[in-house]
Regions:
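Class I (Rossmann-like) S-adenosyl-L-methionine-dependent methyltransferase catalytic domain
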Residues: 1-56, 64-112, 131-133, 152-276
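Conserved S-adenosyl-L-methionine
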Residues: 61
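Secondary-structure boundary elements
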Residues: 117, 147-148
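A conserved beta-strand element that flanks and buttresses the S-adenosyl-L-methionine
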Residues: 121
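Short catalytic micro-motifs in class I SAM-dependent methyltransferases
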Residues: 124-125
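ABC ATPase nucleotide-binding domain "signature" loop
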Residues: 128
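A short glycine-rich, Lys/Arg-flanked "PGG" loop and its adjoining helix->strand segment in the class I
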Residues: 135-147
Length: 278
């Protein structure tokens, strides 16, 4: 996609942390491009949601500042909270970019902040979580966002699953790809744990636009302002706006989706066999 805005003159601190796992080999420019792209999407959300200012910002997971450095350069006035399970990353963001450090928790229900946020950026988090943790994360994001606040998070959908189905190499090799694709075609949500994650639950999650839209119906206070396919690398971008009581709670309470995803009609037409080349 073309750049949405020109941030070429923005004074971004390009200092890289020695232990930043997102920078490898000759991928430094891609690292900065993804950070800049995130800021473009965040600025787009401010226009879309009529939010010219974001005084309180949460970057979760912040890593070593791939996106946060751009937030600091553009929103110099903002209080930016850096949160991650990687404590070295949190410490680096605090020391280098003046962020407020908060160490995350594996169970986000155990994570508490002293204030709500005007903007929450969540890049590539729910893309690694199973169904229950995915929904828990969304519950927490809504809870942590103040009235008229914005949530932006990324997902993996049709682009990512198409690459897997077509046998594209160097996308993801350490999961059960046929099982992931079959479940995705059947329900719109699928998760497979990484082969090496023997003592944890961390892997790849994929979600369809339809599944996400249905899931968001649990939240009468949340408006989906945008769903942008392939807007952050191969990941989709979702922009949500919080407004209390905007919709009638006609479809239940947040617990309604605490069950296995509902099968879709796709299986009736042999779509799974076609997708997997059988």
């Amino acid at each position: 996609m073309k750049p949405l805005y020109d941030f070429s003159t923005l004074p971004v601190d390009r200092t890289l942390a020695p232990r930043d796992g997102m920078v490898a080999g000759d991928l430094t420019e891609q690292y900065f491009d993804l950070g800049r792209r995130a800021l473009e999407l965040i600025h787009f959300s401010s226009v879309l949601c009529d939010k010219p200012h974001y005084p309180e910002i949460l970057d979760l997971p912040c890593g070593h500042g791939r996106v946060l450095r751009w937030l600091r350069a553009h929103y110099g006035y903002a209080k930016i909270t850096a949160c991650d399970l990687d404590r070295d990353g949190v410490d680096f963001c605090a020391q280098q970019f003046g962020a407020l450090p908060v160490y995350s928790e594996p169970d986000l229900n155990q994570l508490h902040f002293p204030q709500q946020f005007d903007l929450i950026w969540v890049g590539s988090l729910v893309t690694h979580l199973n169904h229950d943790r995915w929904l828990t994360t969304l519950d927490c994001l809504v809870k942590w966002t103040r009235e008229c606040g914005v949530i932006i998070f990324t997902t993996q959908g049709r682009c990512y699953t198409s690459l897997l189905a077509r046998g594209q190499r160097n996308v993801t090799e350490n999961i059960d790809k046929p099982a992931l694709l079959e479940e995705f075609a059947r329900t719109g949500f699928a998760y497979q744990k990484y082969f090496e994650a023997e003592h944890g639950d961390y892997g790849v999650a994929v979600t369809s636009p339809e599944w996400l839209q249905r899931t968001l119906q649990r939240y009468p206070d949340i408006i989906m302002r945008a769903y942008l396919e392939e807007a952050w690398g191969m990941q989709d971008v979702v922009i949500l706006y919080k407004k209390a009581g905007h919709y009638e709670p006609a479809l239940g309470v947040p617990e309604m989706n605490r069950v296995a995803p509902v099968p879709t009609p796709a299986t009736r037409y042999g779509f799974i066999d076609w997708l997997l080349g059988r």
